[in-house]
Swiss-Prot record:
Propeptide, chain numbering: 26-69, 107-115
PROSITE patterns: CALCITONIN
Stored Gene3D superfamilies: 6.10.250.2190
Keyword Secreted included in the entry's annotation: yes
Organism the protein comes from: Phyllomedusa bicolor (Two-colored leaf frog)
Keyword rRNA processing: no
Compartments reported by the entry: Secreted
InterPro entries xrefs: Calcitonin-like, Calcitonin/adrenomedullin, Calcitonin_CS, Calcitonin_peptide-like, IAPP
Protein name, per record: Skin calcitonin gene-related peptide
Lineage: Eukaryota, Metazoa, Chordata, Craniata, Vertebrata
Amino acid sequence: MVLLKISSLLAVLGLLVCQMYSSQAAPARRALEPLPDRVTEAHRLLRALIRELTAEDMEASSSGAAHKRSCDTSTCATQRLADFLSRSGGIGSPDFVPTDVSANSFGRRRRSLHV
């Protein structure tokens, strides 16, 4: 999404620069119009584009649809287990099956005593 916005902004900037060079080669406006006015007009156009892009970002970030992040760390696994226990009725529930969660259950290498 950000890449699309950046590429569109660069395309608009490129078109703006090309338009500025072509207007100096064959002016479509009055020749008496001062050059700084054209530059300020370009600045106004860029400011309006940037405001529009930031408004779209704010609108997208404030929308109700939040994206759920996935993580595989032990903290997230513990949090998912706690959520499951709270939804299922906890340890006092008749459907509760205790699991073996010890230091040797998973994630550790077994050390060989043979050297």
